[in-house]
Swiss-Prot record:
Gene3D superfamilies assigned to the protein according to its UniProt record, in alphabetical order: 2-enoyl-CoA Hydratase, Chain A, domain 1 (3.90.226.10), Lyase 2-enoyl-coa Hydratase, Chain A, domain 2 (1.10.12.10)
SUPFAM superfamilies: ClpP/crotonase (SSF52096)
Protein name: 1,4-dihydroxy-2-naphthoyl-CoA synthase
Annotated organism of origin: Staphylococcus epidermidis (strain ATCC 35984 / DSM 28319 / BCRC 17069 / CCUG 31568 / BM 3577 / RP62A)
Catalyzed reactions: 2-succinylbenzoyl-CoA + H(+) = 1,4-dihydroxy-2-naphthoyl-CoA + H2O
Length: 272
């Protein structure tokens, strides 16, 4: 099915589009298998931040331009002495900020993977909430081959997903795995023919959009709290505070302070 995606903002190295409640962020560097630069990542952070704040967006899809690659990780031609060097000549690893944003954004994020999801590209797949893979998808890590590694989500959280033995295999051997192998190890949620991958992804988004956004927000925060330590607890605590602010009980405390009177909290139930 052909659908008309609306461009919400123009970028140099990504696309940011919208369709019926779905925001789609596309890495647009197909000539290098959608490898990212600091600029690519900065643009993705901006787009994800906009999607987070946009009341019309319920679900976010991350993908790569074309059928050959989702993302092949950091562009090694941009790698300098202390990180990836952008137009400002400052070496940085801002992809770590992007990973964290994808984790804490209070909306489901789905990776739509066609072709290669390798290195840092596979880590982006790992940190997304769900993954719809085309049958031509290829997954793997290359860090130890090129003098790099991801000791955060790319290894620790990966081990939570596929198990410690398999995660060590993925990193120590730097092999590549096809879509069915990725499905078997729990790295993706489903595999569909390449020509159907966007249709299936949109279908999953539409199914998700039928459900309570507050419930989904708390479920994501709860699962993150289990794996992300105090940072995960902070996310869930913030969500709880936000929800509390919407109650009459919280408003009574606020209004009493503004009106310089004692709050009347006796009117609210004390649930067991």
């Amino acid at each position: 099915m052909t659908r008309q995606w609306e461009t919400l903002r123009e970028y140099d190295e990504i696309k940011y589009e919208f369709f019926e409640g779905i925001a789609k962020v596309t890495i647009n560097r197909p000539e290098v298998r959608n490898a990212f630069t600091p600029k690519t990542v900065a643009e993705m952070i901006d787009a994800f931040s906009r999607a987070r704040d946009d009341q019309n967006v319920s679900v976010i899809v991350l993908t790569g331009e074309g059928d050959k690659a989702f993302c092949s990780g950091g562009d090694q031609k941009k790698r300098g002495h202390g990180g990836y060097v952008g137009e400002d000549d400052i070496p940085r690893l801002n992809v770590l900020d992007l990973q964290r944003l994808i984790r804490v954004i209070p909306k489901p994020v789905i990776a739509m993977v066609r072709g290669y999801a390798i290195g840092g590209g596979n880590v982006l797949n790992v940190v997304c909430d769900l993954t719809i893979a085309a049958d031509n998808a290829i997954f793997g890590q290359t860090g130890p081959k090129v003098g790099s590694f991801d000791a955060g989500y790319g290894s620790g959280y990966l081990a939570r997903i596929v198990g410690h033995k398999k995660a060590r295999e993925i990193w120590y051997l730097c092999r590549q795995y096809n879509a069915q192998e990725a499905l078997d190890m729990g790295l993706v949620n489903t595999v569909v023919p390449l020509e159907q991958v966007e249709d299936e992804t949109v279908k999953w988004c539409k199914d998700i959009m039928q459900h309570s956004p507050t419930a989904l927000r708390f479920l994501k925060a709860a699962m993150n709290a289990d794996t992300d330590g105090l940072a995960g607890l902070q996310q869930m605590a913030g969500d709880a505070t936000l929800l509390y602010y919407t109650t009459d009980e919280a408003k009574e405390g606020r209004d009493a302070f503004k009106e310089k009177r004692n709050p009347d909290f006796d009117q609210f139930p004390k649930f067991p």
